[in-house]
Regions:
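Structural/interface elements that position substrates and couple domains in central-metabolism enzymes
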Residues: 1-543
């Protein structure tokens, strides 16, 4: 360890005060878990006081979570660490505040200068996926704020999913420029990617293994080892150790940590794409994907892994929809920069150029395209079902009403970031359909046409609907009774299109619905049942 950073960390002592920049799905649970750990004295949550998100400041300081949907334990923990919990010791309200206040949300970024450790949990979307151009604007703003108030011996950790090479590159440069300090010499810098899923945020942070990758430090003889021997890695492990209950710390280099996060999400996206493609094949062959899945997954034995995932109406969320492109961009950037840096203090063994089949598209990008296609397939199923009902979605005489159930991309959540429901909505709107949207958790969304809203009135949304399209697997949709829904819909030959495998096809077919479902080739062309009469399939009726 360089003598300077060693002395700075020794003088600073253990991490006691933490700043978390970004109060969203990642930053809020991380901040309150830090605050709940006895090893730490105080935590600041930093949030811009903007028109769109400034409301979070007052809510959090009042002990309220701005995140909707089901998040076990989060509401209670926020109340506890903000000093707003009320209990008489038996779990009953006494009207008295219990618990020491250890967390505060603020828009005053100058308080970063008080912190021993600063984490950044800020979204990193893409401006152009085709050209591999990310939108790092919010992250850059956060880094500039951190750098502006950075003091010697502070640890800075990027939790955001980022293009490999960002920590050692852009992040390091901005922090050094703003602070006048040198990373690895005057302050520590690491990447510790979040690995959370909405609906189980606290559990994921506590129980998942934590990847921790610090940058290199420099001594008199040049670069010192990175990975677990890096002082930045060791300091970051000190930060995350107290919040883990089952998870272990896994040290590595900063770039390896970046690749780990982008690769694990890319691989999951690839697995989902494999299930989606097989579901399309099963539809085309008139068989049930779920029978095939059960059969494939039944193969067990030493060294055998056949954990096929579920198909669906599309992949959403902030991570899987873009992390493939971070990985694709990263291999180009890191490979190039390592070659250019040969002979400098940053030099390592210059890598070979990427060797890949000429003219062939990345398997990962193709998988991403398949998953992006699935809401388009939902639209195709919708049109096909309407034709069986003698109705046409597209055309000048179109008066089709569609009830879209579930705007969130994830079941029982309010997270609608990059939701595939928006693609389906836009396709139907462009075809001239009238769309009503129901979601028990998502209250509003900025991308809707003027006059369109998201309602929590289920009966009002489905009334008069020619089509019910299920885009999210909320628990409220699992117990729907088809006979009751048919009465509320009140149209002849109602259609239901199941994009999340949440309903029993036979029950809905028996109730008179025309059914379509992803992967249900065995049911997508069924006998129509109208007023108790079975109507045989015919060439005109076949989808």
């Amino acid at each position: 360890m360089s003598s300077k950073i060693k002395g700075l960390l020794k003088a600073r002592g253990p991490i006691k005060k933490i700043g978390v920049i970004g109060m969203g799905y990642v930053g809020i649970p991380a901040a309150v878990l830090f605050a709940d750990a006895p090893e730490f004295d105080y935590v600041y949550g930093f949030q811009r006081d903007s028109k769109t998100s400034g409301y979070k400041i007052d809510m959090l300081n009042a002990g309220e979570s701005p995140l909707k949907g089901e998040e076990p334990g989060l509401d209670e923990l926020i109340k506890k660490v903000t000093g707003n919990a009320e209990s008489d010791g038996d779990g009953k309200s006494s009207g008295k505040s219990v618990g020491r206040k250890k967390f505060e949300c603020t828009s005053d970024f100058s308080r970063l200068s008080e912190c021993d450790a600063i984490t950044l949990a800020i979204q990193t979307p893409f401006k152009s996926r085709e050209d591999l151009i990310p939108d790092f604007t919010p992250l850059i703003m956060g880094l500039r704020n951190a750098g502006r108030y950075l003091t010697p011996g502070t640890l800075v950790v990027l939790e955001s999913t980022i293009t490999p090479g960002t920590t050692e590159g852009m992040a390091r440069e901005i922090l050094e420029e703003e602070s006048g300090l040198v990373a690895g010499v005057d302050f520590c810098l690491a990447h510790a990617p979040e690995r959370v899923m909405v609906g189980r945020l606290l559990r994921n942070i506590r129980e998942h293994d934590r990847i921790v990758g610090g940058i290199k430090s420099y001594g008199a003889d040049g670069a010192l080892p990175d990975g677990m021997d890096s002082p930045s890695t060791k300091r970051a492990m000190e930060l995350y150790g107290p919040v883990l209950t089952k998870g272990e710390l896994i040290p590595m280099s900063a770039t390896a940590a970046e690749v780990t996060k982008t690769a694990e999400n890319t691989f999951r996206d690839l697995q989902i794409a494999a299930a989606n493609q097989l579901a399309l094949y099963c539809e085309a062959m008139g068989i049930n994907f779920y029978d095939v899945r059960r059969g494939v997954n039944s193969l067990k034995g030493e060294g055998i892994t056949r954990a096929m995932l579920w198909p669906g109406a599309g992949v959403g969320g902030h991570c899987l929809t873009k992390d493939t492109y971070h990985l694709e961009r990263g291999v180009k950037i890191v490979n190039t920069e390592l070659g250019l840096n040969a002979g400098t203090k940053d030099s390592r063994m210059s890598p070979e150029p990427l060797d890949f089949p000429e003219g062939k598209e990345s398997l990962y990008v193709l998988a991403r395209q398949i998953n992006d296609f699935m809401p388009h397939h939902m639209f195709t199923l919708t049109k096909s079902a309407l034709r069986r009902a003698g109705k046409v979605l597209e055309g000048p005489e179109n008066e089709i009403k569609i009830a879209l159930l579930g705007w969130a991309f994830l079941a029982n959540s309010d997270d609608a970031r990059d939701t595939p429901a928006e693609i389906y909505y836009r396709l139907c709107k462009d075809a001239g359909a009238d769309i009503s949207i129901h979601d028990p958790h998502v209250l509003s969304y900025p991308g809707l046409d003027e006059g369109d809203t998201i309602s929590q009135d289920f009966d009002g949304v489905i009334a008069g609907a020619d089509v019910i399209a299920v885009l999210a697997g909320h628990k409220e949709y699992l117990t729907l009774k088809p006979e009751e829904v048919a009465k509320r819909v009140g149209v002849k030959c109602p259609v239901i299109v199941d994009g999340r495998n949440v309903i029993d096809p036979d029950m809905w077919i028996e109730a008179g619905f025309i059914y379509k479902g992803i992967g249900r080739g065995d049911k997508n062309v069924h006998r129509l049942i109208l007023s108790g009469q079975h109507i045989s399939k015919s060439p005109e009726m076949k989808s």
